[in-house]
Swiss-Prot record:
Region Binding to the DYNLT2B-DYNLT1/DYNLT3 dimer, annotated ranges: 416-495
Origin species: Mus musculus
Primary role: Acts as one of several non-catalytic accessory components of the cytoplasmic dynein 2 complex (dynein-2 complex), a motor protein complex that drives the movement of cargos along microtubules within cilia and flagella in concert with the intraflagellar transport (IFT) system. DYNC2I1 plays a major role in retrograde ciliary protein trafficking in cilia and flagella. Also requires to maintain a functional transition zone.
One Pfam family hit: WD40
Alphabetical list of InterPro entries matching this protein: DYNC2I1, WD40/YVTN_repeat-like_dom_sf, WD40_repeat_dom_sf, WD40_rpt
Name of the protein this chain belongs to: Cytoplasmic dynein 2 intermediate chain 1
The keyword Ribonucleoprotein is annotated on this UniProt entry: no
Length: 999
């Protein structure tokens, strides 16, 4: 700088200008190329967004910048003659190795410089012409821009920011690649220099580079504070600039707009030139990548040559290595100056004394010059009111520090390296994330509902609060047509009348229109079947009363009945067997109904003297009611001799009989007497009933071929024992639909089971299929099963005595499937209807061996149903239990060896039974009183006893009676009422009997 010229802030070297001047003076084609590339890159980066958006800038500022650059070039040429000599020496040493390449690069550089100077001159001329042609347009545009600046600010800022950020990103990527490559070269050179120079202090520059790596670590902690102070100073600087711009607002709008137009025009032209140069530089850069290896080798030689030149000669090359770190320059004043002075002081202590002095003088001169320039520039701005144009809202904020004049430059290599690495790492992550975002894309084609909660209605809410858990109410509706409706109206007046058809009197109708509804007499409801039953019972009572009155009158045959009362009875009566059709007929059998105890049937043989041709050849059966002894209720006739008989198990309306010819006959006592034969005897008509159904002559394949020994009803558990005080005969409606079984046993051991069937309707003309059915009858027998008892009754010793003969059969009342059969060998067979295996199969007497003893009668106890009595022909009486083969008790000499012909339990006392033998004796047994023999016996003579049966009412224990119905050889039948001691049960007699049986 000339001593007489006043120095201002513009005279101070800027970082870009200083690097440019040093590299141009060095004369190296490589350095010139790098400088051009960096400048073109920087100009394109700063000018691209401004040119595209037509931002207004100050043209005078650009002109002043060019003048200052020329002055710096002149100042540099005068201030550094020594550096130029060093560079010329360096050029001469490298001239032999790079003649061809240097010539090419120099020619290219000169052409570019010439083109640049020529283009600048043309730009000025074009700018003047454009300024003259578009002056009016610019004025209108300036006025329009000033008016619409505030409205377009935000919109333009967003657009410019997007475009500028895109351009900066591209430029930074290219710059990062170049910086990474330069960093690698610098690090390689640093290692080589370190190996070459080591820690020698004779080479201060190499030693300073060696120490730089260690100092970077200490600078990291200071970088944060420096950046913070830098931001604070930047904010303060912006405030000062804003204040200065407010003072300089006195400039006319015309001048401001002209400057903006000139600035935009120049920057646009510069942007075009720099864009063309940057494109050419890119092509040259690609071509020089191939020569990179050769350049590295040449640089090593250059470093070896520079060892003799000293630190002053190495300075330009050092500047070249760090040319890309212009963004890391910081404005230093205040605390930064003190820090720089402290660091320079530490370095000066390590350098030689002469070099320390030289460095200190340079630093003092630079600091003094910067202070003076700052003061002068501030005074100048205050006097002239000159300020820079206010930056637009859309201008990039990073450009303001570069336009602000600086007073000093400090190169922070550690921070620059750290920032560069951070930028590269962030850029890589951003690039990777953008690529991944293109690959990873969410698919919105499917939509799933994670929770679908429909609204809750009132019914569901009620069930949730008051209903049972895990249950749901359901309802159905049927019979939809049955709809009821309620209406409100007046009562309907009604009247009831009655009539009778056919009329049986004068009053055949009732009711009157004159009478009110309340006066009408309500006719009571009449139950006709119930009335009929009542009348029937009443008639029976009346008949009994009349019978008693007749007995009291004392007929001829009554006094003798009282004289015939036995010792075992309190009173006696005699049935009227002196009827004309019963005279000279002996009684062969007596049977009492177990359901209706007052009903007894007597079987009469053929008469000894002829009486009536229609009756003399027929056997008679008379059904008696012991309460009406004057005459039989029904008189039945049979063609064959009757050997056994029984009543139906439920009600005594059916009578079954077995004949000597093997046939089974049935009488239905409910039939109308008009369908039977009537005979007039002694001025009285008697109805003689023929059998309703007979198996004689039909069903020959299953019918018996030998005389029947027994016939028994097969009782069931559903049958209930009843005592009928009233009439034993009911109407057909009451008995309709009944069905049960009857078993018939002959002496050969054939047991037939018959089903009693009641037809729904009687046919008066008879049946063509059922030949055994009487015309108008409704009861018939259907064969069910046949059981052959001969095989089960065979014994190994029975061959000596011939075939076994069966004499009697009884079914177990509690289980009609089981039955026992008495034989003529003293054995009692135990079998079932389904041929099941039973135990024991045979009940035997206490004596071992087989004896020709007939088991004439068997009777089950009505109280202890598993216990039965057996009377034998040898006079022995056995008490068997169904579960034991041998008898519980056996009495051998109770009848003095006379055969037992009849044996029955008392219907009122569990421990009492009566026995009849063939010697016309009656024995009364009371096991609780004496279990060794009978407690009473009654011989009957001279009219001997033929048959005996017991009648009574077990349900009426207090007022009950037990009577013996005795048939004598003379054909008379009398009723003996037993004494109360044998009819009234004792306390707990049933339980005492069980204890006795268990012993």
């Amino acid at each position: 700088m000339e001593p007489g010229k006043r120095r201002t802030k513009d005279d101070t070297w800027k970082a870009d200008d200083l690097r440019k001047h040093l590299k141009v003076q060095s004369g190296s084609p490589k350095e010139e190329k790098k400088l051009r590339e960096k400048k073109a890159h920087k100009d394109s980066e700063s000018a691209a967004p401004e040119y595209r958006e037509h931002k207004s800038r100050d043209p005078d500022r650009e002109a002043r910048h060019k003048e200052k650059t020329a002055e710096r070039d002149l100042y540099t040429s005068t201030e550094h003659p020594r550096g130029e000599r060093d560079r010329e020496r360096h050029k001469e040493r490298r001239k032999d190795a790079k003649d061809r390449e240097k010539d090419k690069l120099k020619e290219r550089h000169r052409d570019q410089e010439a083109e640049k100077a020529h283009s600048r001159g043309k730009d000025r001329e074009r700018e003047k012409d454009r300024r003259a042609r578009k002056e009016e347009i610019r004025q209108s545009m300036a006025y329009h821009d000033l008016l619409s600046r505030d409205m377009r600010g935000r919109q333009m800022a967003e657009k410019v920011e997007k475009k500028a950020s895109k351009i900066r990103t591209e430029e930074r990527e290219r710059r990062d690649e170049d910086s990474e490559r330069i960093d690698e070269d610098r690090e390689r050179r640093y290692r080589e220099r370190k190996l070459q120079y080591g820690d020698s202090k004779e080479h201060p520059l190499s030693y300073w580079l060696y120490k730089e790596d260690g100092e970077k670590k200490h600078r990291k902690a200071k970088d944060a504070d420096r950046e913070k102070r830098l931001r604070e100073k930047s904010s303060m600087r912006e405030k000062r600039e804003r204040h200065a711009r407010e003072k300089g607002s006195s400039l006319s709008d015309r001048e401001v707009e002209d400057r903006h137009r000139e600035k935009r025009h120049k920057e646009g032209l510069h942007y075009d030139d720099e864009r063309r140069r940057s494109h050419a530089d890119k092509k040259e850069r690609s071509s020089k990548e191939e020569h990179k290896k050769r350049e590295l080798k040449e640089l090593e030689k250059e470093d070896n040559d520079l060892e003799a030149t000293g630190p002053d000669e190495y300075l330009p090359n050092l500047e070249d290595d760090f040319v890309d770190y212009e963004d890391d320059f910081e404005v230093c004043d205040g605390d930064d100056d003190s820090n720089n002075e402290h660091e320079a002081r530490e370095k000066a202590e390590e350098l030689p004394l002469a070099q320390k002095r030289e460095i200190q003088e340079i630093q003092k001169a630079i600091s003094a010059e910067n202070e003076r320039v700052g003061e002068l520039s501030l005074k100048m701005f205050q006097k002239q009111g000159w300020t820079e144009y206010t930056k637009e809202p859309w201008t990039d904020a990073n450009d303001s520090p570069s336009r602000t004049p600086v007073c000093g430059i400090f190169v922070d290599f550690a921070t620059a390296s750290h920032r560069q690495k951070s930028r590269s790492q962030a850029l890589k992550q951003k690039t990777r994330s953008s690529k991944l975002l293109r690959l990873i894309d969410l698919d919105f084609s499917f939509t799933f509902s994670l929770l679908d909660l429909p609204p809750v209605n009132e019914y569901d809410m009620y069930i949730r609060n008051f209903g049972k858990k895990n249950t749901k109410q359901a309802y159905v509706q049927y019979n939809e047509d049955n709809v009821e409706r309620d209406i409100q109206t007046e009562d309907i007046e009604t009247r009831e009348v009655w009539t009778q058809h056919p009329g049986e009197g004068t009053a055949v109708s009732g009711g009157s229109e004159e009478k009110d509804f309340s006066d009408v007499t309500v006719v009571p409801k009449i139950d006709t079947p119930r009335l009929a039953n009542f009348l029937r019972a009443a008639c029976q009572v009346v008949a009994v009363l009349l019978e008693e009155d007749r007995l009291a009158a004392g007929p001829s045959w009554i006094p003798r009945a009282q004289d015939k009362a036995l010792n075992i009875s309190d009173s006696s009566s005699q049935l009227n067997t002196s009827l004309p059709f019963l005279q000279s007929r002996k009684v062969s059998c007596l049977h009492a109904s177990r359901v209706q105890r007052q009903t007894v049937v007597s079987v009469h043989d053929l008469p000894e003297k002829a009486f009536a041709p229609s009756l003399d050849s027929r056997h008679l059966l008379c059904v008696w009611d012991i309460w009406q002894p004057s005459g039989p209720q029904k008189v039945l006739i049979c063609e064959s001799k009757v050997t056994c008989c029984c009543f139906s198990p439920l009600k005594a309306f059916l009578l079954f009989a077995g004949t000597v010819h093997g046939s089974v006959v049935v009488w239905d006592l409910r039939e109308d007497s008009r369908i039977h034969h009537y005979v007039r005897l002694s001025n009285c008509f008697w109805a003689f009933r023929t059998p309703t159904f007979s198996t004689d002559g039909i069903l020959t394949s299953v019918n018996h071929r030998s005389p029947l020994q027994a016939i028994e009803p097969v009782a069931t558990s559903a049958y209930k024992k009843q005592s009928f005080v009233l009439s034993p005969f009911s109407t057909q409606e009451e008995m309709a639909g009944l069905s049960f079984h009857i078993a018939s046993l002959d002496e050969t051991g054939v047991l037939n089971v018959w089903v009693v069937v009641e037809l729904p309707k009687a046919d008066i003309s008879g049946s063509m299929s059922d030949l055994g059915l009487i015309p108008g009858g409704r009861i018939k027998l259907v064969h069910s099963t046949v059981i052959q008892l001969g095989n089960s009754l065979s014994h190994k010793d029975s061959e000596l005595w011939g075939s076994t003969q069966t004499l009697s059969v009884k079914f177990l009342p509690s289980d009609p499937n089981h039955f026992v059969v008495g034989t003529d060998m003293g054995l009692i067979s135990h079998s079932t209807r389904q041929d099941w295996r039973v135990s024991p199969r045979v009940f035997k007497p206490e004596q071992h061996g087989v004896r020709p003893i007939k088991v004439n009668v068997i009777d089950f106890s009505p109280f202890e149903e598993t216990v039965f009595l057996a009377g034998c022909s040898d006079g022995s009486i056995r008490l068997h239990q169904l579960t034991s083969e041998r008898p519980i008790m056996q009495w051998d000499n109770s009848t003095s060896g006379h055969a037992v012909t009849s044996l029955q339990w008392s219907p009122t006392r569990p421990a009492v039974f009566l026995v009849q033998d063939d010697a016309s004796r009656i024995y009364v047994w009371d096991l609780l009183e004496n279990d060794l023999g009978p407690v009473a016996q009654q011989p009957i003579s001279p009219d001997k006893l033929v048959a005996m049966t017991i009648v009574g009412e077990p349900e009426k224990t207090s007022g009950s009676f037990v009577a013996l119905v005795l048939a004598r050889t003379s054909g008379t039948v009398d009723v003996q009422n037993l004494k109360r001691r044998w009819t009234t049960p004792a306390v707990d007699e049933h339980s005492q009997l069980r204890l006795l049986l268990q012993k």
